[in-house]
A protein has these predicted regions:
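Canonical Rossmann dinucleotide-binding motif of NAD(H)/NADP(H)-dependent dehydrogenases/reductases
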Residues: 2-29
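The beta1-alpha1 cofactor-binding region of Rossmann-like NAD(H)/NADP(H)-dependent oxidoreductases
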Residues: 35-36, 56-67, 99, 212-213
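Substrate-binding pocket helix/loop in short-chain dehydrogenase/reductase
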Residues: 93-94, 98-106, 199
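Active-site helix of classical SDR
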Residues: 117, 153, 161
Length: 219
C-alpha cells in the first residue's frame, strides 16, 4: 500500500480525504495541529483496514514538517502521497484587516504548503514516485469580499503548484491542485443564512459541496 500524508486531517475536507485514501488502500499519516481531534479520523482509517499515524504538526513551522517527514520515513520507510489540505481563514475587509491576520493566513496556507512539499520531495524524487495534491480554492481565481488574505494565499498555491509540477515531472512526481468552491464544513458553518442562500443561488446544483465531493476529486 501507499503511504499518504494528509494535513489538516482532523475534520472536514481533510478527514474525508484521509478516509477516502484509506478505502483506496493507503496507510495514512493524520497530520494536524490538534491530535486529540484527529482521533476520529484515525479510527475511520483503521476501520477501513489501514494503518494510521497520528502526528501533531504545525505546517507553518519548517522544523515541524521536517521532523514529520523524518518520523514517517523512520516508521514506515517511504512517503508516496502528500495532500496539503491544512488551511485557515481570518476574514475581514482590507482596511480593517490586522497585519497579524494577513500574516497568519499566508503562513499556514502558503508557507505550510511550501514547507510540507519541500519536506517530502527528497524521498519522492529518490524513489521516483510521488503524488502531491494541494487544496487551493476557487476564491484564489475569483476573489471574494472580505478574504484578501485567503484569496492571495490560494492564488499563490495555484502558482506554486504549476511551478513545482514543471520542476519534478521528470522524476515521476506529479503536483496538482484541487480548488473547492463553497463546501459544507466548520469553516462555512459560521456564515449567516442569508450569505449561504446567496451562495447557493450561484451554484448550478443549488447546494454547497460536501467534503466527500472534494475527497473523490483528490482520489
Amino acid at each position: 500500500g501507499r503511504v499518504a500524508i494528509v494535513t489538516g486531517a482532523a475534520q472536514g475536507i481533510g478527514r474525508a480525504i484521509a478516509e477516502t485514501l484509506a478505502e483506496a488502500g493507503a496507510d495514512i499519516v493524520v497530520a494536524d495541529l490538534d491530535p486529540t481531534r484527529s482521533k476520529e479520523t484515525v479510527a475511520a482509517v483503521e476501520k477501513a483496514g489501514r494503518k494510521a499515524l497520528n502526528l501533531k504538526v504545525n505546517v507553518a513551522d519548517a522544523n515541524d514538517t521536517k521532523a514529520m517527514a523524518e518520523q514517517i520515513l523512520k516508521d514506515w520507510g517511504k512517503i508516496d502521497i502528500l495532500v496539503n489540505n491544512a488551511g485557515i481563514t481570518r476574514d475581514g475587509l482590507l482596511l480593517r484587516m490586522k497585519e497579524e491576520d494577513w500574516n497568519l493566513v499566508l503562513q499556514v496556507n502558503l508557507n505550510g504548503t511550501f514547507h510540507c512539499t519541500k519536506a517530502v520531495l527528497q524521498p519522492m524524487t529518490k524513489q521516483r514516485y510521488g503524488r502531491i495534491v494541494n487544496i487551493a480554492s476557487i476564491v484564489g481565481a475569483m476573489g471574494n469580499v472580505g478574504q484578501a488574505n485567503y484569496a492571495a494565499s490560494k492564488a499563490a498555491v495555484i502558482g506554486f503548484t504549476k511551478t513545482v509540477a514543471r520542476e519534478y515531472a521528470s522524476r515521476n512526481v506529479t503536483v496538482n491542485a484541487v480548488a473547492p468552491g463553497f463546501i459544507d464544513t466548520a469553516m462555512t458553518q459560521g456564515l449567516s443564512a442569508d450569505v449561504k442562500e446567496a451562495l447557493q443561488k450561484q451554484i448550478p446544483l443549488a447546494r454547497l459541496g460536501t467534503p466527500a465531493d472534494i475527497a473523490n476529486a483528490v482520489r
